[in-house]
């Protein structure tokens, strides 16, 4: 079993408390019948990844950030849109990053720089590292993220919103 722990300091998190039933024996529970595990909400992961992409801007070559953002929006009902809206605003405020840079805006020259990085990133992924087929084009990933943001949140400026 592979366990990965990511430690973060200084960020705000509203954890979720999940009850978990423990394994029991024929004589009953080994210890307690249920424990409570605090979990990091997916909306906070999304908000922190999005803030990192915005903050790093054209200095961001971390394809994992784009992969994670795409995966979270691609999974049906993974994110609660209204909660995501609140959490993104909270994380951006806490990290002193403006939401005015949403949706993601990259010029074609930067997309041309990202594309080979994205291609190599996708090639190096094992099948266990992705549960969703990833687009071949980084532009498609960015467009999907932007589309989700404009359709599901109030984070984009009114001129960026798509008509309903």
Task: Spell out what each predicted region is.
Residues 1-164:
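Structured mid-to-C-terminal alpha-helical surface segments
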């Amino acid at each position: 079993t592979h366990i990965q722990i990511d430690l973060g300091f200084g960020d705000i998190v509203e954890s979720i408390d999940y009850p978990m039933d423990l394994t029991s024996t024929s004589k009953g529970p080994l210890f307690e019948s249920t424990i409570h595990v605090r979990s990091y909400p997916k909306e906070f992961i999304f908000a922190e990844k999005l803030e990192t992409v915005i903050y790093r801007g054209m200095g961001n070559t971390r394809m994992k950030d784009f992969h994670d953002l795409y995966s979270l929006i691609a999974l049906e009902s993974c994110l609660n849109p209204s909660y995501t809206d609140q959490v993104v605003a909270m994380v951006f405020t806490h990290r002193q990053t403006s939401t005015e840079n949403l949706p993601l805006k990259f010029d074609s020259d930067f997309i041309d720089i990202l594309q080979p990085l994205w291609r190599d990133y996708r090639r190096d992924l094992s099948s266990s590292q992705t549960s969703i087929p990833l687009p071949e084009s980084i532009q498609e990933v960015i467009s999907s993220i932007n589309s989700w943001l404009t359709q599901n949140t109030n984070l984009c400026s009114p001129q960026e919103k798509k008509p309903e």
